[in-house]
Every structure is written in C-alpha cells, then in structure tokens.
C-alpha cells in the first residue's frame, strides 16, 4: 500500500487577452490555440494525492486499485483560480487479472472518472440575432468559466490473452472489449437557434431581434471490440 502527494506550480502561463482565460483550459470547444493575442500573466497549480493498494494476491489471481484525488486550476484575468478543463477531481481504477493454465490470461479494469467542468453560455447575448449572426454560434459566458460540471463517468474493459512460446520469439494473441456495458458519458450540451426542422426559432415577443435557443444533450461512448497479434522477438 502506498500513499503519495504532489503539488506543481505554474508561473507566467499564457492568458488570452480577448476572453481572459488561461490557454491551459482552452480545448477544441473554445477555439484554436495560437491564433490570438496572449499575455504571459497567468498562474496555475495542480495538486492532489494518489493511493495504491493490492487488494488481493492469491495463487494466479491479482486485484489492485488506484485512486487519485487532484485539482487542476489556472487563474483568469482577475487573478482568480478557475478549474481547468481537465479538473475531474477523481480517478479510480480497479484492476484484476487471472492466469489460467496453458498461458491464458484474463484481465479486467473498471474505471471511474469525476465529472469534467464546463462553461455555460451567455443566453442574453446568444438570443440576440445580430450577435448570433456574427459567429453563428452561442456565446460562452467566460465570467462563469467552468462553473458547471458534467456527471461522473465509468466503464468496464476486459481482455483475454494467449501466449505461444517459440525458440526465439513469442506470439501473443488477444481480444479486447472496451466499455463492455456500453456506458454513455455526458458531454457539454450543444446549443442551436434552429428547431428539429432546421428553421430559426424566433422569439414571439420580439421576432425581428431575438431568437430562442434549443439545448441538445450530447453523449459519447460505445462498445469497442479489438483483436490483435503481438510478436515479441
């Protein structure tokens, strides 16, 4: 059993001039990194603890677990620490394997990840038709950057291996299935100004200037089977 702690400090990290957000938190949903003016004025920190333990070691059965609690934060233009886009807080892995006769091995891993932070949109600005037409998308509310969180996610992966030994090399045949029970993880929602038929949704109170926003729930995750061959010389 082991328990370790870590702490890392960042100084002079690039900070976007236009929206006041650290480039460390800019994923594909916020724009392309490198195409905007920045200042080397940001700070960041990453810290946490990691726990490892062998739960069971009996004959050919091995079960281990690792758990990490961590925080990843970077300052905004006001110097306030905000969660980075990778600040999921919790990471748990439960790993088990069993060696059968004749070089067969079966293993499984269950993984749990805390919900990632995401940023709401500025509804007042996004429902303004003139503003929407400039970017043709909803406006991120950077004043509430990463203030919301997605639900936690988890999945089970399983694998079976067969090793065949030759004089000068080893053949490893394997079959792997990721996300066995087909868990669908929640992604940040998608915002559109169109209905299901593709028509712009005018606001009846002010159809010339305002529009309605439709929120679409987004999910990812699928069962992914793989078979392969590994040759070791």
Regions found by a protein language model. Give the residues of each.
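C-terminal beta-signal and adjacent terminal beta-strands/loops
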Residues: 11, 111-136, 151-155, 162-233
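Asparagine-centered polar/low-complexity signal
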Residues: 40, 93, 146, 179-185
């Amino acid at each position: 059993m082991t328990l370790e702690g870590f702490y890392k400090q960042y100084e002079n990290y690039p900070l976007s001039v236009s929206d006041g957000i650290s480039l460390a938190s800019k994923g594909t949903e916020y724009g392309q990194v490198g195409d905007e003016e920045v200042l080397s004025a940001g700070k960041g920190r990453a810290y946490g603890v990691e726990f490892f333990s062998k739960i069971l070691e009996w004959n050919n059965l091995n079960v281990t677990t690792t758990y990490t609690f961590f925080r990843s934060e970077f300052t905004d233009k006001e110097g306030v620490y905000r969660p980075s886009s990778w600040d999921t807080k919790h990471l748990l892995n439960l790993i088990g394997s069993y060696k059968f006769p004749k070089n067969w091995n079966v293993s499984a891993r269950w993984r749990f990840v805390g919900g990632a932070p995401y940023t709401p949109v500025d509804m007042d600005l996004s429902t303004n038709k003139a503003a929407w037409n400039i970017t043709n998308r909803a406006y991120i509310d950077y004043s509430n950057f990463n203030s919301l969180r997605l639900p936690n996610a988890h999945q089970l992966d399983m694998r079976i291996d067969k090793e065949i030994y030759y004089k000068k090399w080893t053949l490893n045949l394997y079959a792997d299935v990721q996300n066995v029970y087909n868990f669908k993880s929640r992604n940040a929602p998608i915002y559109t100004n169109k209905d299901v038929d593709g028509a712009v949704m005018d606001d009846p109170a002010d159809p010339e200037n305002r529009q309605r926003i439709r929120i679409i729930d987004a999910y990812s995750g699928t069962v992914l089977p793989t078979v392969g061959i590994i040759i070791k010389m």
